Amino acid sequence: MGNYSTAIDKKWQEKWAESGLYKFDPNKEGEKLYVLEMFSYPSGSQLHAGHWFNYGPVDSWARFKRMQGYNVFQPMGFDAFGLPAENFAIKTGIHPQDSTIKNIAKMEEQLKAMGAMFNWENEVVTCSPEYYKWTQWLFLKLYEKGLAYRKKAPVNWCPSCQTVLANEQVVDGACERCSTEVTKKDLTQWFFKITDYADELLDKLDDLDWPEKTVSMQKHWIGRSTGSQVNFKVKDSDLNFDVFTTRVDTLCGVSYVVLAPENPLVDEIVSAEQKEAVENYKEEAKKQSDIERQSISREKTGVFTGAYAIHPLTGKEVPIWVGDYVLATYGTGAVMAVPAHDERDFAFAEKFNLPINRVIEAKDGSETNLPFCEHGILVNSGEFDGLTTDEAKEKIVEKLASMGLGEKKVNFRLRDWLVSRQRYWGAPIPVVYCEECGIVPVPESQLPVELPYDVEFAPDGKSPLAKSEAFVNTTCPHCGKPAKRETDTLDTFVCSSWYYLRYPDNKNTEAPFNPELINKMLPVDKYVGGPEHACMHLLYARFITKALRDMGYLNFDEPFTSLTHQGLILGPDGLKMSKSKGNTISPDDYIKEYGADVFRMYLMFGFAYTEGGAWSDDGIKSVNRFVERIERIIDTAREAISKGENNKTTMDKAEKELNYWRHNTIKSVTDDTDKLQFNTAIARMMEFINALSKYTQEKEMNLDFLKDVVSDYLRLLAPFAPHFSEEQWSLLGNSYSIFNEAWPKFDPKALVKDEVEIAIQVNGKIKNKIMVSSDLDEEGIKAAALADEKIIASTEGKTVVKVIVIKGRLVNIVVK
């Protein structure tokens, strides 16, 4: 048993806190490094192993960078609003404010037990009025710039959570929070105009040091399509509608058009005979999520409206159908159907026996089956016959434009961000409604609009704040007459869309942040968190940064320069941890038994950081044995240094061998840690301890050299085992603190050995290993190999046919 324990953890945590070791000074020397882990929801009562995997290894990386001379800023806070706390309150009867404050206190205690160098003086908690005052300020600024607006729209509705969900919060047709099937509902809601930034959000992605998969996910979510907009007139009426298509070359193959069930045009054109069927279909469509409706594998459904459109080129009548695979929120809510050249249209046409008109053939004239979805040569297209797809796109749009029936168009999959929620536990939207003045933003001087405590928040589909007359009834800031407050609250993603800007200036009462300070501190240099936020938080934060830049508050384009996603720690059964499965891992129990550093090192050694894996009790025990072994070997070295006996001052063979391992380890650990490859960095330190152990068994040692080697090793170990290393550093007689020491630098010359080990093979089988001078030429190596006693015995009575020398590695002697 070693001496390392939680008592050592506590001792050094108190010392670090007393001395203000990690207090951040923006004016301190050294290049600024803003390191940020995505902050936690304090909805559960404590940190689990997954939280630790996010925070512990990144803290080690930040410590490593601090020792390299960077001025590291690593704050911590809590994403404290949102459904989890409110649902917990509904279940237990404990008010979300009370449970959140209690949970934050517990999580702060656990995070401090980790021994991380978080800058707690910069903490932010999004549910505090001091924070959400500025979330409301952000809303007002976006409203001023026309980037926040209110409209009635079909929205995603979760019947269980009784609230609206953004598109990004619907996963496979279900609520991401509770897995209930999502339906559609028409509601008047607040939106942020993220689509104004669609082009820049897409174009700047390739400039970021982000995981390729996350970049691809955002690109797909933004979904820029370059195509054409075509206008169709409705037969026997003044009505018309636009469709967006990327294949205008297939226009002459249109045999029907399809409107989304929510398209308002449907009610205007439906015939009396089809009205009941269309209404029934629209009701059914409301029960389907957008993702389900667009599934390629799902059987297509639809209903005829009884109305017809006029083809813009041929003048022919084409039937107008309603189909739920068309979304009102994408493009124009209407599509032209070309079943001969689109798989979805083909399936629909076959099901409802609609015409299928081929207008594209293969370029080489070969026979092709329908649907034929490739580019090719136009046929059955009148004046456009014989043109290639690309030529036809240009010519057809030119003709449509000359007739006032079409134009080139860029379309996006991205929709505006729906930010209002019919729930209690969120930042109130700072708006009042006045019969005289209409929508009136609350003046900045009246912020924050505080969330009342005494509110009935059980969900019933209405905003809980609407039940509080004291909250709702107010006076209009503009005319002074009675007015009503907005009773929806802001999506919690609004709170987290700007929190990284508040950390460096969290005590500012006059503004959300000082632009001069923030422009010096930002962007975040290293951001770490889960990949599940690729199309939500990470996209929203980019939008808010760009909007504030354009308002003149920021001088940078992107919030997070470099992004890393940590992997997932699974339960011992290989399944995702959950209380219901009974496979959760509580860090507290393991820390109590082994200490925080052993727990941290197991997470870093037992798993590749970006991959994760299944928890293993055997793994943490082996790391504990490794730490105990380090302690024993350093104790032996320290005792030898203290006694000063059998000392020598020369650098002989044993010293050179240890020096080689010392600098090899410095190089490897530095390179691996920089790339967040912590498991291989620790493996290198395990290898080194073998070399150090071997050296401490020498009869004579160079004790000054030994102390330097042990000091270097402790500096390498310090970011991974901060409490243990600080203790060992102190016991070695060094001044406080090891984290004020510089990171060791490797000496390339030390990696050049005087002698190298050469394996000698006879007919491909290793017979012996010998040491030779590293500068010995091939002839010399060959001679040394042939002169070796074991090789002489192995080749006796045989003829040497050939000797192959691979310098620095092996000799293969071919005999017969």
From Swiss-Prot:
Nucleotide-binding listed as a keyword = yes
Quick check: keyword Zinc-finger in the entry?
no
Pfam family, any one: tRNA-synt_1g
Q: Name one GO biological process term.
A: leucyl-tRNA aminoacylation
A single GO cellular-component term from the record reads: cytosol
- The EC number of this protein is 6.1.1.4
Please give the superkingdom of this protein's source.
Bacteria
Q: Name one GO molecular function term.
A: leucine-tRNA ligase activity
SUPFAM superfamilies linked to this entry: Anticodon-binding domain of a subclass of class I aminoacyl-tRNA synthetases, Nucleotidylyl transferase, ValRS/IleRS/LeuRS editing domain
Give the protein's recorded name: Leucine--tRNA ligase
Taxonomic lineage of the native organism: Bacteria, Bacillati, Bacillota, Clostridia, Eubacteriales
Gene from which the chain derives: leuS
